[in-house]
């Protein structure tokens, strides 16, 4: 049977002032929820409200997911969301970048377009090697061209480099909420 959205969840989305997509796996956590009939429409209703429109934030992943988002950069993540119903609905993309991970970001791989190419991309790559999602100045500008305001911050947990640091994320959320509030005035 086809997936159906829980009516109370759709109501809450329509009434929301702040909608957050992520952090999470792009193709197995975030986008599948957008494919459920009614979810994107509820986000659109909240976002397009005349009085007190909702602000929609996307929290970009810190690192690629083996077999899912290999080689995708920050622009690719936001573009994937726009191609899955979120065009014109994303206000801010929270993107990670810091001096320690930037050198690692240069070791990313081109996105797989055909699964048969997977062997080529993984050849010589050590299992468990971390590749942070690339976020160069040029890519951040491309995110802006999609109509999404990028907010670039150091968000990594120094103890667990594939996790967001919850305190850094909380501070960034406070900034986003302040930006959304001032935009609505």
Segments the model singles out, each with a brief description of its role:
Residues 28-31, 65-70, 101-105:
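Short acidic/glycine-rich loop or secondary-structure boundary segments that cap or lie
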């Amino acid at each position: 049977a086809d997936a159906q959205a829980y009516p109370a969840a759709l109501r809450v989305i329509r009434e929301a002032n702040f909608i957050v997509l992520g952090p999470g796996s792009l193709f197995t956590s975030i986008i599948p929820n957008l494919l459920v009939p009614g979810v994107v429409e509820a986000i659109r209703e909240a976002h397009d409200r005349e009085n007190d429109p909702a602000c929609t934030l996307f929290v970009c992943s810190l690192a690629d997911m083996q077999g899912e988002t290999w080689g995708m950069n920050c622009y690719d993540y936001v573009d994937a969301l726009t191609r899955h119903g979120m065009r014109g609905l994303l206000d801010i993309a929270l993107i990670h970048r810091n001096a320690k991970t930037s050198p690692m970001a240069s070791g990313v791989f081109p996105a797989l377009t055909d699964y048969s190419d997977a062997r080529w991309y993984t050849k010589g790559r050590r299992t468990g090697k971390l590749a942070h999602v690339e976020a160069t100045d040029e890519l951040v500008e491309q995110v802006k061209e999609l109509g999404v305001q990028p907010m670039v911050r150091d968000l990594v947990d120094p103890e667990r480099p594939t996790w967001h640091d919850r305190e850094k994320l909380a501070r960034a959320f406070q900034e986003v909420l302040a930006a959304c509030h001032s935009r609505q005035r």
